[in-house]
Structure formats: structure tokens, C-alpha cells
Amino acid sequence: MASSDERPGAYPARDGSENLPPGDPKTMKTVVMDKGAAMMQSLKPIKQMSLHLCSFACYGHDPSRQIEVNFYVHRLNQDFLQCAVYDCDSSKPHLIGIEYIVSERLFESLDPEEQKLWHSHDYEIQTGLLVTPRVPELVAKTELENIAKTYGKFWCTWQTDRGDKLPLGAPSLMMSPQDVNMGKIKPGLLKKRDDEYGISTESLKTSRVGIMGPEKKNSMADYWVHHGKGLAVDIIETEMQKLAPFP
């Protein structure tokens, strides 16, 4: 079972609807319980998400497979961000993965084998692919300048674009759009996003002129661009640790 499998296993039955995942509607009892819990619990981790970014991503083993992604960002400090990734920003989104974002300084401290798993962000910002929905460019400029110098590691755990009604198989490593043939986002996908938010990616390029990427771009990031090799996850059986942790 690998993240590059076209079909990792038996798919849930498809009924021709767009409902993901399959299941019965919430009962009134469940709705009341959810509302009560929301009033009484702090939900502190969720409330730390303070920024919404929308961009695109390519599968690490097949850059021709591209998806729109919505990142909800929690900034732990100036050098580290953690993001919940959804396939849309509607009231019924699907949580499809997580991305960690680190500063150039932290990225350079990583082992080269670890660096292979990370991607840069400067191209998607400079070309207007990454946007801050409903936030004016002038307001977002400083944030975009900061993110352009960072690196990200994005694991996709639910391939809804493939039609999976449930999260199936191994997680897939995702990569950012790049200025190479397979890394350029398909026009139809771009138009759909722009129409949804009433923006023009092409016109954003002008306002992004002068935004710079990392001081020294590391070639271990965006590994598929520089080395022509994709990366996939495989799941194998292994012997379990049979010694008890306590006497």
C-alpha cells in the first residue's frame, strides 16, 4: 500500500452523489450536544488559527495531479507555522492534510534527507497563485514577503480529488507549483479559484514584483524539480517491539 497507488484498496460504495464521506445526517441530539460542547469547551488550539491562505499543490509522485488547497494557519513563533489543510473554505470542508512551514534558518538546520520532503513558496507567491482570500493585497504584503522565504512540508491524507469518499491508503507528500512544465497550474483549476474569490491571479503578479525568496535557494527542496525523482510513501509490515516498557 503506497501513496502513489491509483487505488489503494476497496473504495466505499459510490451512490452517484457528491457526499463525502458517506453517512447518515446528524441527529438533533448530536446537533444539540455539539452546540453545548462548543459553549462549554475552550477549543483553544482551533482558535489559534489566525490566517487563511489559498493556493495549489501537486502530488509528489505525479505533479500532473493538482488540487486547490486552503490552509488555516497557527503561528507558533516567527519561524514555525502549522496549518490544517482543507479542500475548500465552505461550511462543509474536508480536512485533507497538514502542512508545516519553517523559516529559511530552520530549514537550513535540517538533514539533507529531511530537506527532500520540503518545498519552497516563493514562486507561488511571486506569480499570484498563493492568496489571502478577502484580505487586500496592501494589507497582506508583509505576510506574503515573510512566507516567500519559507519552506513547507505538506502531507495529504485524503485524496478527495481522486474521488475517495473516505481517507484511504498512505499519506501523499505534496509539492508546491514551480516554474517548470509539470509544475505549472492548469488554467481551468486557476480560473475556478479566481472566479470563486473574484480575483485575477494574472493581475496580482504586478503587486508581487520585488517579493524575494530565500536568500540562498536550497536545491534539496523542490527535489523533483532539481533531481527528476518523485517521492512516495510505502507501508510495510514490521516486527513489533515485544519488550514491555515497565517490569
UniProtKB/Swiss-Prot annotation:
InterPro entries: OBAP-like. Residues 1-26 are annotated as: Disordered. Belongs to the OBAP family. This is Oil body-associated protein 2A. It comes from Arabidopsis thaliana (Mouse-ear cress). The lineage of its organism: Eukaryota, Viridiplantae, Streptophyta, Embryophyta, Tracheophyta. The gene is OBAP2A.
